[in-house]
Amino acid sequence: MTKGQLNIASGECLIETVYRADGALERMRGLLGRERLAPDQGFWIAPCNSVHTFFMTYSLDILFLNKEGILLKIVSELSPWRMTGMISAWATVEMSAGQARALGLSIGDKLVWRAC
């Protein structure tokens, strides 16, 4: 995994620590077996257009982005043992439940992952 930040296109940092899944195994594992994300943490998976919370013990907010980083869909507080997806998405960002709302994210926002 590579550590970076999630920024809005203007350059403002939204989430200080966002890990990017670099390989197929990391993408498949996702957050399984990992501790709950803190409010200042996230997990970027690309390519990815669906996620599940099977075997997880906590809820997540899920962002679906296209290749340009445009936010297409927000799934708030996806409970354990659920699935969600979006055919046209290229990447997902997983974050702690409630963070999408707390950050004021909206459909159409342009998001960028930047390495630290």
Residue ranges and their predicted role:
Residues M1-C116:
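Compact, glycine-rich, soluble single-domain proteins
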